[in-house]
Amino acid sequence: MIEWGISAGAHDASITVVDGEEILFASHSERFSGQKNDAWLNNQIINEALKFGQPTKIHWYERPAFRTVRRLWAGQGFQHFFPSKHMKKCYNIDVPFEYAGHHESHAAAGFYTSNFDEATVLVIDAIGELDTASIWKCSGSKMKKLWSMKYPQSLGLFYSAMTDRVGLKPNEDEYILMGMVAYGDPEKYYTGVRGLWEHENLHRGCRSWRHTDNDLDIYSVAAATQKVYEEEFEKLLILAAEMTDSNNLVLMGGCALNCSANHIATKYFNDIWIMPNPGDAGSSLGAIAANNRKKLKWTGPYLGKSMGGKYPIEKLLTELHSSGIVGVANGPAEFGPRALGNRSLLADPRGNDIKDRVNEIKKRQKFRPFAPVIMAEHASKYFDLPVEESPYMQFTARCKYPDLFPAIVHADGTSRVQTVTWEQHPELYNLLHTWYLDTGCPMLLNTSLNVKGKPMVNSEKDADDFEQMYGVKVFS
């Protein structure tokens, strides 16, 4: 029975298609429209989903009526959205709809893709219908919400407001703010930033804060923001551990993408699972899981539109040896914000000029860090990882030999590591293994195959355009 899950109407729209326990397709609307963080569906993604058959039911990722009430309470006016009418009017799809709560969808997306029989689930985001953080106890088909933080208090809104305050785009550039932290002094504005968290409703931002300070050190604002976030994150972890008796933690919501903070969770839980699309886009999958309350067969994040033939290992190696930088667009696209080998820009991490060259190609700020992808069995030799494996770039780790790999080490000496095994991605693993035999280097720089402000490559035309515009060979 074909069922769809949909997340749309706020930001990062997506569709997931399942048949029983099998995940057949999951992708982001932005990959088809070309509009970064696209909030709405489009004909292209609908048609891609329809290739797997007409849906018998659609699961929606939140409860629109509750969202309408929250908007009224927040003074944002009356605006009610009817998902079923929208799908019928725009796409001629008229099937039964079933709704799940916003945080319920987050929690279910995490738990029902994990390998845990039972777990504590911690969800942290900007805002659901009313919840902004929640703690759940999940076991089998049972999900029980034990506690929640309510709007307007919100760690996600706090982080987004501070992102806006330093001149970046909220709900999009939070990862840039995280990269700025290494260049700032967390104590310089700590008292003021903590005061904003404790005393202000930050839903409409905080641009007036220190508005007369013409010499505002935005890097130190970022550092103070991260410090406050980590302090409050740890409080939530402690509360979650106290309220449950599980050693397993599922971490979900957009804040689970804060890889600089995620290591804190290892102090309180033995095993941690973060579904690689923990934000709202992942809730298209979560809505299905929340309503059906059964495990989905998670085989990895490669669930999107497929392109190319055999993974072009030899071509990639030749170009890496020749120019040091190459693109790959092959197989099903990653479901989530990280490129994990199928829509990647790969580079030799040893070159002193590689980081600047890749930043120039991607039109990014020069202070931005890049991630390494490394064979899992070599990871502990080169990085102090807080977990055994990090297949989805969800944790930072200190590099033991930063001078050897300048392209993938941030200013604070850390790297956002992706480990890979043959079972997880045999082609990427074989590429790394051959690269290692050729060079003695077991890793590559791995970043997404896109430029700032644009989605990842999603078609042969996208790949050709990238190659022609930016002078980088892209192989499919």
Predicted features by range, described:
Residues M1-W4:
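Extreme N-terminal starter segment of soluble prokaryotic enzymes
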Residues G179, D185-K227:
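Active-site cores of enzymes that catalyze phosphoryl transfer or operate on phosphate-rich substrates
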Residues F97-A100, D215-E231, T421, H425:
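Short acidic-aromatic active-site loops that bind/stabilize oxyanions
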Residues Q54-F66, F97, D245-G254, G327:
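Short glycine-rich phosphate-binding loop at a beta-alpha junction
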Residues S29-Q54:
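N-terminal phosphate-binding loop and adjacent alpha-helix
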Residues S7-K36, R67, R71-A74, F78-H80, ...:
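Flexible beta->alpha loop and helix N-cap segments adjacent to enzyme active/binding sites
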Residues A223-L249:
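Phosphate/ATP-binding catalytic cores across multiple sugar-kinase/actin-like superfamilies
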Residues I45-K57, L237-D245:
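Phosphate/pyrophosphate-binding loops at sites that engage ATP/ADP/AMP, CoA/4′-phosphopantetheine
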